[in-house]
Amino acid sequence: MLQVFLVRHGETVWNASRQIQGQSDSPLTAVGERQAHLVAQRVRSQGITHIITSDLGRTQQTAKIIADACGLKVVTDPRLRELNMGVLETRPIESLTPEEEQWRKQMINGTEGGRIPEGESMAELGRRMRAALDSCLELPAGSKPLLVSHGMALGCLLSTLLGLPPHAERRLRLRNCSLSRVDYQESPWLASGWVIESAGDTAHLDMPALDELQR
């Protein structure tokens, strides 16, 4: 049975200031770096064999901290990027016009054809995230990969594995540097294919490393 660990990146400057990131980028805050070190300590004894990350800076920063703790190198996969938020990227959430907020809500609510101009649909996000996960099946037997990605991207992936629509990701709370795990099993009496073992685990994060919602 293949086990794949999933980690969301640490808190970023734009997470803290409530700006839309998408595939634009901002660096980890001091809190985000601490979160990354804590999740690294959590997984270093799990026998991780591969660290695969989105090619965006915030995930690469997080992945490097984890890889150093595990004695591994980082491999990038652009399919693990966050949803492309088009013309709204870099914008403070509070600055959106009513029309722009409608674009955003239609997309996250699963309205047919919903997408931000110059951006990506939730269905497109789900397909590329699933392709990235399925690529783990091609790794050598006995591998235990860890993927570092983004909040909406990972939520969309987990939703689709459950047979839910991609926009169900908004019902999953995946905090910065939370840890999830999915397993690929082949069984005559259990559901074959990908199953979710855990999602959004933050047991490794201490109080200073938790976001305001958790506190």
From Swiss-Prot:
One of its GO terms (biological process) is glycolytic process. Gene3D superfamilies: Phosphoglycerate mutase-like. Its EC number is 5.4.2.-. It is an enzyme of class 5 (isomerase). CDD domains: HP_PGM_like. Substrate binds at residues 8-15, 21-22, 58, 82-85, 151-152. The keyword Lyase does not apply. It catalyses: (2R)-2-phosphoglycerate = (2R)-3-phosphoglycerate. PANTHER family: BROAD-SPECIFICITY PHOSPHATASE YOR283W-RELATED, HISTIDINE PHOSPHATASE FAMILY PROTEIN-RELATED. This is Probable phosphoglycerate mutase GpmB. Signal peptide: none annotated. GO terms for cellular component: cytoplasm. SMART domains: PGAM. The gene is gpmB. It comes from Yersinia enterocolitica serotype O:8 / biotype 1B (strain NCTC 13174 / 8081). Keywords: Glycolysis, Isomerase. InterPro entries: His_Pase_superF_clade-1, His_PPase_superfam, PG/BPGM_mutase_AS, PGM_Phosphatase, Phosphoglycerate_mutase_GpmB. Belongs to the phosphoglycerate mutase family. GpmB subfamily. Pathway: Carbohydrate degradation; glycolysis; pyruvate from D-glyceraldehyde 3-phosphate: step 3/5.
